[in-house]
């Protein structure tokens, strides 16, 4: 009898991507989640993957059960039912650790840039050689019998520890997830443990002092802009159309590359992709051709226009990510007003990085703050508010509410950069609706 894979929490970004990948490989897949809409469900619906509400009736002993990491006995009826009846299940990262053993696997780890880099690597490789992939924006592609598997490798709660890939990219090490990690040393320790799992090669950003501290049985290739990097980008040109650079491996030029993406961080992402592909022996001309056609991933500098107004949607929710996103906006729109609309994500992160958030938000011309989006894992003890953060920002900064986003209308030809990992897209949609109403009234 054909096995059924049931996903508890199928709308999660990693879970939805994994479900899609298994479906494309011909597996029978279904899943359950809340009835709220998530952007990840669109691909599942297009693939006709059954989406069910949480219910213990969904759980059968013959199913392969895969559970999202956030779900426990006390908050999910399916997990409670499985435990009560002794039905085995695997967490997402546990299942993935076993799954990748059938491929030459390439992980992408790092505090920032995982999803964009995974998407870029998957795009390039899948256009050259059969490659299955799993991206953190909810995108997955499964090819039965493919040689390579590209996946996003998450450090939170050390979820990447069941993974033993042949190769990995490490984009950076930074302190995040203060609800779990105690500090930068704790984060670095997690990456060191992960490095020990890698079988054939690590590609690490060379200007990151903590990545330089790592040791591993597999060789470590550093990439960046400095002379002591194994893979180095030179002759960098950043314009309103994207970025271009020459790539060198230990002094030997391996190609000229153009990527239609913005910000220094995306040059580094592209260089890491070039490094992996070069190490695998892929043709550099083909790599250059397919880098040029990369169009990004969901919720990473995703642009749209409403009349003359530019709206950018980005998942940035850490100071380092906000700085990179605003830098990218400046590169593409150097002569326009940059308006940051940021929703802090989790109270623990907002408390831990309040000063850093204020500092990087000053890179915008004007700042608006949405109410803090608390996670399901925490309780608001009223230790910090969005207004507290606004008071720290030197540039003009206001707090807005979802039921009144009209202050955002005060900027002619503004470039609005909506950033956050909570429900910031609701503010964005409210603003788009308001813009459309204003445009209609003016006609």
Curated annotation (Swiss-Prot):
Source organism, top-level taxon: Bacteria
Subcellular location: Cytoplasm
Pfam families: Mur_ligase, Mur_ligase_C, Mur_ligase_M
Keyword Cell wall biogenesis/degradation attributed: yes
Keyword Cell division listed: yes
Reaction(s) catalysed (UniProt annotation): UDP-N-acetyl-alpha-D-muramate + L-alanine + ATP = UDP-N-acetyl-alpha-D-muramoyl-L-alanine + ADP + phosphate + H(+)
GO biological process, one term: cell division
Catalytic EC class: ligase
Reported function: Cell wall formation.
Family to which this protein belongs: Belongs to the MurCDEF family.
Protein known as: UDP-N-acetylmuramate--L-alanine ligase
